Amino acid sequence: DAYEYLMRHFATESGKSKGQFYTPAEVSRTIAQLIGIGPHNSNRQTTAYDPTCGSGSLLLKLAAEAVNKITLYGQEVSATTAGLARMNMILHDFPDASVQSGNTLADPKFKDGERLKTFDYVVANPPFSDKSWSSGLTPDADPFQRFGWGVPPAKQGDYAYLLHILRSLKASGKGACILPHGVLFRGNAEGAIRKQLVDSGTLVGIVGLPANLFYGTGIPACILLLDKDNANARRGIFMIDASKGFLKDGNKNRLREQDIHRIVDTFRKAQDVPGFARMVGFDEIRSAKNDYNLNLPRYIDSSAAEDVQDIEGHLQGGIPQRDVDALHAYWDKMPALRTALFASAGRPGYLQLRLPQADIKPAILGHGQFQAFQHAVAALHAQWAKSTRPSLVDFGQNGSPKQFIHTVSESLLAAYAKAPLLDAYSIYQHLMDYWAQTMQDDAYLLAAEGWQVHTTVETNKKGKATGWACDLIPKPLVVARYFAAEQQALEAAATALDTASSALEALEEEHGGEDMAFAGFDKVNAAQVKDRLREIGKDKDAAEERDVLKAWLKHAEDVADLKKQLKTLDAELDAKAFAQYPQLSVDEIQTLVVDDKWLAALSAAVHGEVERVSQALTKRVKELAERYAAPLPQLAA
């Protein structure tokens, strides 16, 4: 939304000094989905609280996930930023949200008598390692008994906010807090608090985030997920290392749609994913080896496999078989392709290419099993498109774009969930990128006006028409479907013009040197050429020059004629296309939008993913072949 855009832009431009009040929208959405709120478990009596609410973006993302109206509470130390949060609440139709200004730890504003008020959901992105957290507070004599597990270090207030959150949760409440990675492994007072936190069973999950996501700091952070409900029966903590999934966006990193979906799906399923996520039992966490250290690399190895150089391969030649075996994902699907590419190198454990390096890519693309893979993906996509098309054309006036893209994207993700060699989340990302760039605008237009089209005449500053456009169905789609012959004629004329123009330029270049036909011309044009022809007349000594100048005039005339022809054809095609729009039926509009625009764009994106499979395999095979092509003794000789 507009407010979110302005907040992101302001945080980006302001940097460290002013960016701390804003939690990136992608992180807020991730938390809102991880925490488990939804229309099935929320109503007006559901309460959500952010003790360090900044501009309120995290609370509002939680409310958006709930769908139903819930009751929001927030406290912010900066009076100015609290004012921003109140305005944000009003703009997002939460005028009754209670946003208070003040120091949450020293002067919490939400209380039930002498105790802290408790809430169903608490979310927070507190200042990292707050050095003045205890200002105005005597932790050992805290009236709200927040520090029974221990007092955090004087210069690191991360656990102070976490303990406040725990005290602010109802007996079955759920919470999420963004904190620096240090809270997972720092010792002394924080280690003692962490032990109590683990043993309490309220820490249900940890999500490690990429570095440089947040404004004001580049250090990596994590999301601690809390759940008091059934805490005593909990037997472990679900950990996710999502540090590798992000998009570089200017000088910051940003979670993509696929990153958010992967994190949330994995957490909800509590599904072990090598290198990404696993359920870690309390026994492992409490072991002498780990001693309550929750640092994610202790439990999840997300590092890329090392590309080991093989000494024997360098000395005697041959590609190590283990490097070829490492490409098993390809060979599992295309075993005969491996045989077509590699043969024994004459000794155990080493292989050699069967073909020249230049033939690797053609061999892969032309192999029957790779082509079968291509056909299988095409068939899978065609089946998805066929089954999804009815829901695409059924969307229309008064429809919900948000629900629309959710349904479509989830069906796409499910369709590609078991597709070999393709990452379903990457396919999903293509759809979400297209949604953000184009399809979202189409959906909102359809929701407002239904399946109808309007052309807009474009004018210059003087009010003169300069062209026209249609947002829902761009001109090229209408031309491609109804005027292919005219478009082909236009392209042929353009090609002819390019050829004639090139011939004219070549003639000028060939005869532009010293003492040649065009040597004395400042700029070659028809007037100068004709003047020169009159000047030399029928001079026999200038016969060659005369022929060149006459040839130039003929080429120039051809170029001028072709330009006129091209302009005429373009104007005729433009007029035909413009006249076609009012004649389009609803079925035709749906065909142009759904088939020729939406599904065609997604089909091209899927084809690109298949291309990347061949490129990745080609690159690795070629890399191995080049690495071990010449044994070191041969190089030394």
Give the predicted meaning of each segment:
Residues 1-11:
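Long recognition/docking surfaces used for binding and targeting
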Residues 2, 31, 85, 224, ...:
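Residue-level signature of catalytic and energy-coupling elements of molecular machines
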Residues 12-16:
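Conserved adenine-nucleotide phosphate-binding loops and their immediately adjacent elements
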Residues 17-124, 129-150, 159-160, 179-182, ...:
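Conserved S-adenosyl-L-methionine
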Residues 474-478:
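Extended alpha-helical interaction scaffolds
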